[in-house]
Amino acid sequence: MSSESSFGLMQIGLATAEDIRGWSYGEVKKPETINYRTLKPEKDGLFCEKIFGPSRDWECYCGKYKRVRFKGIICERCGVEVTRAKVRRERMGHIELAAPVTHIWYFKGVPSRLGYLLDLAPKDLEKVIYFAAYMITSVDTESRHAELPNLQVEHDLEKKQMVDNRDSDIATIARDLEDELARLEGEGAKAADKKKARDSADRQMANVRKRADADIERLEQVWDRFKNLKVADLEGDEGLYRELRDRYGLYFEGSMGAEAIKKRLETFDMQAEAESLRDTIQNGKGQRKTRALKRLKVVNAFLTTNNSPLGMVLDAVPVIPPELRPMVQLDGGRFATSDLNDLYRRVINRNNRLKRLLDLGAPEIIVNNEKRMLQEAVDSLFDNGRRGRPVTGPGNRPLKSLSDMLKGKQGRFRQNLLGKRVDYSGRSVIVVGPQLKLHQCGLPKQMALELFKPFVMKRLVDLNHAQNIKSAKRMVERYRPQVWDVLEEIITEHPVLLNRAPTLHRLGIQAFEPQLVEGKAIQLHPLVCGAFNADFDGDQMAVHLPLSPEAQAEARILMLSSNNILKPSDGRPVTLPSQDMIIGLYHLTTKRVGSAGEGRIFSSVSEAIMAYDARDLHLNSQVKIRLDDFVPYAGWEAPEGWEPGQPALVETSLGQVIFNQTLPEDYPWVEAVADKGELSRIVNDLAERYPKVVTAATLDNLKDAGFYWATRSGVTVAISDIEVPTSKPAILAGYENMAAKIQGQYDKGLIDDDERRQELIEIWNKATNEIAQAMRDSLSPMNTINRMVSSGARGNWMQVRQIAGIRGLVANPKGEIIPRPIKSSYREGLSVLEYFIATHGARKGLADTALRTANSGYLTRRLVDVSQDVIVREEDCGTERGLVTPIAVPDSNGELVLDENVENSAYARTLAVDVVDAQGNVLAAGGTDCGDVVIDQLLAAGITEVKVRSVLTCESKVGTCALCYGRSLATGKTVDIGEAVGIIAAQSIGEPGTQLTMRTFHTGGAVSAGGGDDITQGLPRIQELFEARTPKGVAPIAEAAGRITIEESERQMRLVITPDDGSEEIAYPVLRRSRLLIEDGEHVSVGQKLINGPVDPKQVLRIMGPRAAQKFLVDEVQGVYRSQGIGIHDKHVEVIVRQMLRRVTVIESGDSDLLPGELAERARFEDENRRVVSEGKAPASGRPELMGITKASLATESWLSAASFQETTRVLTQAAMEGKSDPLLGLKENVIIGKLIPAGTGLPRYTEVTVEPTEEAKASLFTGPSAFTDFSYDALGGDGAPEFHAIPLDDYDLGNDFR
C-alpha cells in the first residue's frame, strides 16, 4: 500500500484446496507445539520454524546461521530460512486432510447454502455429512434402462426360487410331522404328546414362512428401490443399501460423508439447474416459487462468479500464523495458549489416526466413525458450538474458534481493525483554566515532555545541547533545565487534540494550543465544557498529538476549539457562557431603583468608573453617560440632529456600559438584562454575522467579565434565602376540603376508582401550582436563589418549589402517579412516610439513566453504520425537485410570525426555485442559502412557505450533493465536498438520545383517550421508527377516498369504506374500545387516520408512496425530540430516512439481470432498467422498500462494513459465495484496510493535487541572462556582484512531484 489509492476494490471469494496449498509454507503433520525441555518449536508441529519462519531474527533453528549477513539462506541442516522473526505473523501452513470435510458455514448457516444448491433439507444434509445416511451420487440410467428386462427376469426367477424353496421346506416339515405322528400312534402315545409334536411342527412352519416372506419382501423392496433410483436419493437403512450395492452396484454409485457431497458437486450442472429454476419461477406458485427464488440466488451466485462450489468442501485446512495464536510461558513454568492451538491439535490427531486406519485397511464402520470425528473437529475449529455441544476447555468454557475471533466487540473487526490503540497520547484529570483563551488548554509539564519526547530530543541535538540522540534521551529523562526551554519552543503553534469519552458527537474531540502548566492536571477552558459535556468533579480527558504537518494543519484549521463554536446538530452556538459567568453578567446588567448616584450624568465612561471607585455610584443605578462610539439598537430614539458616529448621551447603567464593552465595537448597543436567553441570542448573532476570530475574542471577553463580576456580586446561598410562603397552610386547607369531597363521592359509589384518582391528581396539581406561584411572589428580586433561577445560571423553578414550597405528587415504581401528594418541602423536612414514597422516583431515575445510556449508544452505532457512506460527492446533482417548507404562520391577530420549527426546517437550506412576491418580483433567487437574514426578509415580504432543496430529493448516485444538503451547520457555510454528512447526522440524532426518557409512559392509570393505553415515547419510539417496526396498537389509514360506514357487533367493530371510484369495499376490523377519529357516513381521503393510535410507516409507504413515508418518518422522529425540548435539524433525520428507503424489491425481472424478490439499490435498479430499455427489451418492475436501520446496514453493498457491524459469519458466508467486491466507498471499509477515509481531505480531489508554478514564479526562477552564450563568467570571479540571484531550491516548490 505504497500510495493512498493503490487499489480501489476488495474482493472476497471461496478458497479452493489449491489456493490453501498456495498460501501455505508447508504441511503441519504433528499436533506438538513446543518442546517442554528446550522450549523450542517441534519440527512439523503447530509452531514449526521450517514452515512458519524463525522464532529469532536472522537465526535458524539449529544455530548454524546467525546474523543478518546470511539473510535469505535456507539452512541445509534444519531447513529454516534465515529472515526476520516477524514473518511468523504472516506465513501460513496447512493440514492435508485424509478425507474431505464440508465447511460448516455453508451447511449449517441459515439458510443452508449447500442445502439450497443441492436441493436438500438441512436435516438430510446433516445425515449424509455425519455418516447417518448414504447418498446416491450417480446413476447409469442408460444401462439400467437397457438391462431392466433381463434384470426383471432374473428378479422374477429369484423370487420364484425363493417361493419354491419356502414351499418345499414347509412340505418337508409336513412330511416329517406325518411320519412322527405315525410313529407315536404305533407306540400308543398319549394325545398330549401328539399335540406337542403338531405344535412344534406348526412353529417351525411359521418360522420358515416368516423368514422367507421377509426375504421376499426385502427382495421386492431392493428391486423397487433400484428401479426408481435417482441421483441425490438418501438411504438411511445400511442393510438395504449394502444389498442394493451387492446386487446392482454396477449401475450406481453412492457414499456418505463429505465425499458424497463432493462427488455430487463435481457432477452438478449449474446451467441446467438455473434454467429449470427460472422455469419454475415463471410458471410455479406459492411455496415452490418462493423456494425456487431462494435456490436461484445461490445457483446464480456460483454461475456469475468464478467461485467453484467445490470450495464448500475442504481437502486441506489452512493453519493461521503462529503469532496470531501464541503460546506464552507463565511464571510457574506452565504455558498459556490460544484456544485455536487446542482445536488445531484435535484436527491433526484425528487426521493422523484416520490416515493410519486407512493404511491398515480398517473396516468401513471404523473408518467412517473416524471421518465423522474429523468432520466434527474441523467444524469446531471453524465455528465452535454452531452444531451440537461446543468443545470445552478447562472449567467447561467453550473454546474460541476462528469465527469467534471475528465476531462481537472483542473480535478482530471491532477490536483491532476499527479501534486501534494510539501512541503519543496521555490522559489526566481536568481542572478549570479560567485564564486560558478559547483556543488554549493547559498541559502538565511532565505529560507534555513525554508526548513531545522525540521532538525535544531532536531539537536538543540540533542546538548542540546533546551530542547524539542517546544522550538527548538521557537529558530528557533527568529533566535537565535546557529541556524545559526546548519544550517551550517546540509546543508553540503545535496543537494537541483533547478527547473526553464518551465521544457522542464530533465536538467530543477538539484541538487546542497547549500552554505548559505546573501540576499534573489538564486545564480546560470553561466555555468548551458544554461541547465535551465535561465538568470538574473528577472527569478525565485524553490528549493526542497530531504528528505530520498535514495532521497539524487539519487540527488547526478544522478542529481548533475557536473554529467549533456551532453545534453540528442545529447550527446554534455550543460555547455559551454558563453558571458563574451568567450570574456575573446578570449582576452587571440588572437595574436597581433607588441606588447610589441614580439620575446623574457623566461626560465619559471613565468619569463614571471614577465615581464607582469612589463609592458615589452603584453599578446598577440608572444614569446618563456620554458614549463616543455608540451604535444604536432598534427602537432607540435619537435626539434631533444626531448622526451615526457622533457621541451620544445614553440613559443606561455603568454595569450595562461595562457589559457592552465586551462586545465588538460595531455591535448594536444591548440594553436588555444579560440572562441566559439574551446571551444565547448575542452569541448566535455573533456567530451568524461576524468572523470566527471576533466571535472567539468576544466569548473570551464575556467569560472574563462574567467571572470577575460573579466574584464581586457576592452571590451565596444560605438556608435563610429559602422562604416558605406564609399562605401555604391556607392554600393546602382549601384543596384538602376539595379532596375530601371527592373521597366522599367515591365512598358513596357515585364515582369509580379511576375517576377518583384522576380527580385527585388534578386537584393536587392545581394546589402545587398555586403554592409555587405564591412562593415565587414572596421571593424578593434580590434574593440570590431568585437571581440564579431567573438568570438561567443554575436550577429551575421546579427545584426551588420542592425546596421552599411543596414537593407535590410523585410516582410509584410502576410509573403511576400516587394520588396523595408530599405536602412538605425540603426546607420544612419530610415525614417518614413522605420520605419513603419519595425514594421510589429517585431510584427509578438512576436505573433509567443507566439503561438509557446503553440503549442510546447502541442506537448511535446503528445510525452511524447505516449512514457512514453518505458523503458530499458533488457540487450539484441538477435536480429540479425539493420540499415545500413553511416559514411563517398567522398568529391569533392574523399577523405573520415565524413558524416555531423554521430553525430546524427551512433554516440553512438552499432555495430550490426563485421566491417571488405577489407582484412577481424576485425576493430571493434559487440556489440562495436560507439564513436568518434571508428568512427575516421573506417574512417581512409576507411569504409563508418556500421550496427548498433536500437530501430526500437529491439525485446523486452515491452520497449526496452540496446544494441539496445546504449549509453545514457546524461551520455556517455551504457544505464542503467530502464532508461526511452521514456520520454527522447519526451523531446529531444519537447524542441527545440519552436525554430522551426511557419508559413507555403510562398515563397514571387514567382512563384517558384509548382506555389508558401505553403510549410509546422517548427512546423506544425513536428506535421503533428507525427500525421501521410496526408499532403496538396500530391505527389503520384509509386506502381509498370514499364514504365510511361503521358496523358494530358483539366482539368488534368494522369500518367499511365504499370507494368513490366504485371499486370493491375495504373493511378494517378494529377493537370496540378504539377511539374513532371519524363519524358514520363521513367522507375520508386517502391516507386519513381512522382511529386513535400510532400509524405503521410501512402502510404509509404502501398507500401513499415514498414521499409521504419520508415526511411521516421525519415528522414523527422530530416530534419525539421536540417534546423533550431538543432541537435537531430536519436534514439530519432526512439523511437517515433516505438510507432507509434506498432499496427496491424487484417484482418482475423482465429481461434484466435482476432476480424477482431481490433487494436492489435504487441506483442499480434504474441503471439496469435504462440499459434494458435502450436495447429495446422489457424493464424490471419493483416497489420501494422501507428497511430498518439494522437491516439496511446489513444489506449494504460493502461486505466489509456489514461484516464489522453484526452477524459477521452470515455476512462473510454470503459475500464469499457471491464473490462480492467492496468498492470501498464508505468510511468504515477504508478504516478496516488502513487507507485514508474518502471524506474531507482524504478525497481523491484533494489528495491528487499537483502544484503548477505561476508564470511570474517561472520568470523569477530564470532571471539573469537568457542564454548561456551571453553569459559572462567575470560576474562570478570579479569583484562586482553577479547580475542575478540564485534561489535556494528547497525554498521553492517547482511543482514537480519528486516523491
Curated annotation (Swiss-Prot):
SMART domains given for it?
RPOLA_N (SM00663)
Look up and give the organism this protein is from: Paenarthrobacter aurescens (strain TC1)
Residue ranges crossing the lipid bilayer per the database entry: none
Task: Cite the InterPro entries for this sequence.
Answer: DNA-dir_RpoC_beta_prime (IPR045867), DNA-dir_RpoC_beta_prime_bact (IPR012754), RNA_pol_asu (IPR000722), RNA_pol_N (IPR006592), RNA_pol_Rpb1_1 (IPR007080), RNA_pol_Rpb1_3 (IPR007066), RNA_pol_Rpb1_3_sf (IPR042102), RNA_pol_Rpb1_4 (IPR007083)
Example of a GO biological process term:
DNA-templated transcription
Describe the protein's quaternary organization and the partners it interacts with: The RNAP catalytic core consists of 2 alpha, 1 beta, 1 beta' and 1 omega subunit. When a sigma factor is associated with the core the holoenzyme is formed, which can initiate transcription.
The entry's free-text remark on the cofactor is:
Binds 1 Mg(2+) ion per subunit. Binds 2 Zn(2+) ions per subunit.
Please give the family membership noted in the entry: Belongs to the RNA polymerase beta' chain family.
Q: What does this protein do?
A: DNA-dependent RNA polymerase catalyzes the transcription of DNA into RNA using the four ribonucleoside triphosphates as substrates.
**Chemical reaction(s) catalysed:** RNA(n) + a ribonucleoside 5'-triphosphate = RNA(n+1) + diphosphate
The lineage's top-level taxon is: Bacteria
Residues holding Zn(2+) 2: 877, 954, 961, 964
Annotated positions binding Mg(2+)? 535, 537, 539
Tell me the residue numbers annotated for binding Zn(2+) 1. Answer: 60, 62, 75, 78
Name of this protein: DNA-directed RNA polymerase subunit beta'
Q: Which terms in the GO cellular component ontology are assigned?
A: DNA-directed RNA polymerase complex
